[in-house]
């Protein structure tokens, strides 16, 4: 699901209700009979838990109207200075069935390390609040399937995808948001990285972004569908739910680390055995 709109604007300069309304409108294009609808990251902005808000009620209606599981990227304010960045799932009956809160936050984007120090020497108005980090693997257990979740920036961390699959994820979802970037560089980088995550884990992957790129990638990393930047789009596709585990899911980075250590040891050992040049023994 991609609501579309202008790109190159900071979140603090964007009206959250406009973004939300755009995705509500786009949801009218969902075809009957779908099992799962995925909205992007940060397209709903509320104070406190989303379930008791007007936006939450509207999302429940979308889920019941489509008869599908609905996964939405939600920003929940937690007081004046903090917030949660969550992927929340509604079942076809309109009830919240699960949620995952983003673990890997973007430094100087979602929080400011050492805020008290930087606040004295810099303007931090573009990052007025700090995200509260989540815990555990990215996983949502839903009526449609158990799905691994990588919220935006987390797609760049292979261990997050591995953790979601090891926890039972049969499909990977990447709700993301690159609307603040005016060029195609970051959206392109995100899709390329998502393709790598799909190959590593052997899972089909669905990425949703408010202004692109939204994409569908198969378990071999092949790009099956992709939106254009800035457009309103609904990508309809069929994905395969998978259960097997690739070598990377089973072993993680251990084989690569072992190979690197072996290469270093192999290069070092001959140097240790090589006799010194230009030396002669005397008695």
PLM features per residue range, with description:
Residues 1-283:
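Enzyme catalytic cores with a strong preference for nitrogen-chemistry domains
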């Amino acid at each position: 699901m991609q609501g579309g709109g202008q790109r190159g604007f900071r979140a603090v300069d964007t009206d959250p209700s406009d973004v939300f309304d755009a995705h509500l409108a786009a949801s009218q294009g969902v075809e009957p009979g779908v099992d799962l609808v995925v909205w992007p990251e940060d397209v709903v902005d509320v104070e406190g838990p989303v379930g008791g808000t007007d936006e939450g009620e509207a999302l429940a209606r979308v889920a019941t109207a489509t008869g599908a599981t609905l996964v939405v990227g939600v920003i929940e304010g937690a007081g004046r200075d903090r917030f949660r960045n969550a992927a929340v799932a509604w079942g076809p009956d309109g009830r919240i069935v699960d949620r995952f809160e983003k673990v890997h936050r973007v430094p100087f984007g979602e929080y400011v390390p050492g805020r008290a120090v930087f606040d004295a020497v810099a303007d931090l108005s573009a990052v007025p609040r700090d995200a509260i980090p989540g815990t555990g693997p990215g996983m949502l257990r839903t009526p449609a399937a158990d799905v691994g979740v990588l919220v935006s920036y987390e797609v760049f961390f292979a261990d997050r995808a591995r953790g979601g699959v090891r926890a039972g994820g049969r499909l990977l979802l990447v709700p993301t948001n690159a609307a603040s970037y005016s060029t195609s560089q970051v959206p392109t980088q995100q899709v390329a990285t998502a393709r790598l995550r799909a190959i590593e884990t052997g899972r089909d992957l669905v990425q949703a972004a408010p202004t692109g790129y939204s994409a569908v990638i198969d378990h071999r990393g092949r790009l099956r569908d992709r939106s254009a930047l800035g457009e309103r789009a609904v990508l309809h596709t069929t994905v395969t739910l998978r259960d097997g585990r690739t070598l990377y899911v089973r072993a993680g980075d251990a084989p690569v680390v072992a190979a690197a250590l072996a290469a270093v040891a192999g290069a070092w050992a001959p140097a240790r055995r090589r006799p010194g040049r230009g030396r002669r023994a005397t008695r």
